[in-house]
Amino acid sequence: MKLFGTDGIRGIVNEFLTPEIAFRLGNVLGNMVDKKIFIAKDTRASGDMLEEALVAGITSAGVDAYKCGVLTTPALALITRLENAAGVMISASHNPPEYNGLKVLMRGYKLPDDIEERIEREMEKIRYCEYKSVGKVIEYDFASEEYFEYIKKQYSFLDLSGIKLVVDVANGATYKLNPQILEYFGAKLEVVNDRPDGFNINRDCGSTHPENVKKNITGSKIAVLYDGDGDRCIFVDEKGEEFHGDKILGITAIDLKKENRLKKNNVVLTILSNMGLEEFLKNNEINVVRTKVGDRYILEEMLKNDYTLGGERSGHIIYRDKSTTGDGLITTLEVLSSLVKSGLTLHDLSNRIPDYPQVMVNVEVKNKEIYKNKKVFSLMKSIKDYRVIIRPSGTEPVIRVLVEGPDLEKITDIANKFYELIKELDKE
């Protein structure tokens, strides 16, 4: 059975993702690494169950399990980098609470495909250590503090006094730490969705549901919204308009270039980033490279060519001189730093970057390979002067259709045609 998707192992708990899978993963990792493995989780009720299974698997292979408790993915990535160790993040990111996931990190980085394939093969067998070598379980209470200290050093110059910020922590992993750090830098906060109960993570809140925050933006307030594991964010400006990943990349790329932080004068985007962003960057003499969808592919391109900045429209942004992975908090601080330096409003900054209309439809299907049908290709060939991207979701039974172009009515009509065609083909 195929376990690893685009972002680790992820699925509905006790239907696809079971304690047995967590145990087997822990056992394989314990047999692959030396000494210790760090474990963190978001606020889902199923996190405790999966954590205990992971711990059992790790220690059964003779390796110590360090439990970090509730922590963001980027904070765990930092710990594994500082400790030169492996880690497992228990989270399904932006997915609803019935989902959970297991994301493996090695010295700060997500695993390449070939290592995941090797792990998947090894999970078919279990190898126990001798009873004298069973690993220990260690409560590692310093992870949040280590991350906090790292951020303070990286942004020691930053003064956010005067910034009024609504912070939507999605009832997820950011609910304590991110507000504490933003307050440390002087921002005046209104924190919402910060009462996790195990079942409300991402529920009508956070980066995938900005509608409620948009309604409540007044005066000079702006908002930042995180996802369940804190590796991405989006903003809402003073006018209640969304300031998404493309806008973040455009604005911060200009500042990175001024500060000589933008290596090789290049930004890495995915195929989903708007053509308006690409035009804006090129007009500012910044080059663009595009990859497949997924922050892992962005990072691979960045590492291969030594680029500093890359990201996705969804808010996964990697500042490689600060972090080895997408980090919602670092993204927040970079945007707010640009905002303070500019003396403008976030809305004014946003308006600098053109944004062609995009329509995305999610088509629920039984067969995710249906998008390869000849009739779908035929319809794509018939579309002129508009960009169409069709791809299966890596985590859900969904095919995503993105249409981009200057005319909203036209792209909506095109998107609906693809929706109807794929639905019809899926019935056959």
From Swiss-Prot:
InterPro entries in UniProt: A-D-PHexomutase_a/b/a-I (IPR005844), A-D-PHexomutase_a/b/a-I/II/III (IPR016055), A-D-PHexomutase_a/b/a-II (IPR005845), A-D-PHexomutase_a/b/a-III (IPR005846), A-D-PHexomutase_C (IPR005843), A-D-PHexomutase_C_sf (IPR036900), A-D-PHexomutase_CS (IPR016066), Alpha-D-phosphohexomutase_SF (IPR005841)
Annotated catalytic residues: S93
Names of the cofactor(s): Mg(2+)
Domain of life: Bacteria
Pfam assignment, any one: PGM_PMM_IV
Post-translation changes: Activated by phosphorylation.
A GO MF term: phosphomannomutase activity
Catalytic EC class: isomerase
Entry-annotated residues carrying Phosphoserine: S93
Record's catalysed reaction(s): alpha-D-glucosamine 1-phosphate = D-glucosamine 6-phosphate
CDD domains recorded: GlmM (cd05802)
Alphabetical list of PROSITE patterns matching this protein: PGM_PMM
NCBIfam families for this protein: glmM
HAMAP family hit by this protein: GlmM_B
The protein's name: Phosphoglucosamine mutase
Species classification: Bacteria, Thermotogati, Thermotogota, Thermotogae, Thermotogales
